[in-house]
């Protein structure tokens, strides 16, 4: 049995020993101060995060997927990052996948014992057809979750690039992966509650991986999300704003170009900047593998 008391995420924080006696302002102030350690901890592992981004770009370019998997809060964070990619970057929902121990119902309610299975993640990987072109990213704050360990072992056996994200140095999951990302954020404000600093660190890292990989495959022009999907009125206006910002055109011109481009802001931008008709602009974009700069 693993001695949890030896894990930093399970030790008591000396700065919050009187947590139950603090005023609301004192409590939120100490939490805010402790969160500064998260930023510092993530900064220390940026080279490893950058490596994960490079691998993710390579996987996407090879037709593979980014597959996050974890249990509890860690699994929920992976799902959260995955589901934001289609509306933000215009990708299919199966390009960035989030798996949580206990399946979708575990997102809103804990499924007891699901994380303790070494075989469960392998079964789920087989259901989605995990293959060597995919990058498998296991997330476990403690770094010892059997669900994640089993998933990493199976992914490695297929030849996938494997990444482990944990908040304890020298973690068990880190030893199972080709790349370990292990930010040191210190003990939690509330002892063992890894939804706090550990969860924040994991979310920051996942933000970097998904954003960096999508930028790497041409889903941004300058700092504009040019593949945004117009799924509601707000996003229709945003697509117009993005087109205007990228080209300097008027709102009317942006709306007209977007209509001709079937709502594709990236295509509308290339049309406006090159003064090409839609078919020629589309061919330019395809030749540039979806990169706006390459099409100009």
Where is each model-derived feature located?
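Short, amphipathic alpha-helical interaction segments embedded in low-complexity terminal/linker regions
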Residues: 213-296
């Amino acid at each position: 049995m693993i001695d949890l008391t030896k894990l930093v995420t399970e030790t008591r924080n000396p700065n919050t020993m009187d947590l139950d006696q603090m005023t609301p302002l004192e409590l939120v102030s100490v939490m805010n101060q402790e969160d500064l350690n998260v930023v510092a901890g993530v900064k220390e592992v940026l080279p490893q995060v950058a490596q994960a981004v490079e691998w993710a770009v390579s996987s996407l370019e090879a037709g593979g997927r980014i597959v996050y998997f974890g249990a509890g809060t860690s699994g929920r964070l992976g799902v959260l990052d995955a589901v934001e990619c289609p509306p933000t970057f215009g990708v299919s929902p199966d390009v960035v996948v989030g798996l949580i121990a206990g399946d979708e119902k575990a997102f809103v309610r804990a499924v007891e014992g699901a994380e303790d299975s070494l075989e469960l993640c392998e079964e789920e990987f087989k259901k989605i057809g995990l293959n060597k072109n995919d990058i498998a990213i296991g997330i476990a704050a403690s770094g010892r979750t059997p669900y994640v360990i089993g998933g990493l072992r199976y992914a490695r056996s297929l030849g996938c690039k494997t990444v482990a994200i944990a908040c304890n140095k020298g973690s068990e999951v880190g030893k199972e992966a080709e790349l370990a990302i292990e930010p040191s954020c210190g003990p939690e404000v509330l002892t063992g509650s890894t939804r706090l600093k550990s969860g924040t660190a994991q979310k920051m890292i996942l933000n970097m991986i998904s954003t960096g990989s999508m930028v790497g495959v041409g889903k941004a022009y300058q700092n504009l999300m040019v593949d945004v999907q117009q799924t509601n009125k707000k996003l229709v206006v945003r697509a117009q704003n993005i087109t205007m910002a990228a080209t300097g055109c008027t709102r009317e011109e942006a709306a007209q170009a977007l209509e001709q481009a079937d709502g594709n802001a990236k295509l509308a931008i290339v049309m406006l900047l090159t003064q090409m008709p839609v078919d020629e602009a589309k061919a330019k974009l395809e030749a540039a593998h979806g990169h706006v700069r390459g099409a100009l």
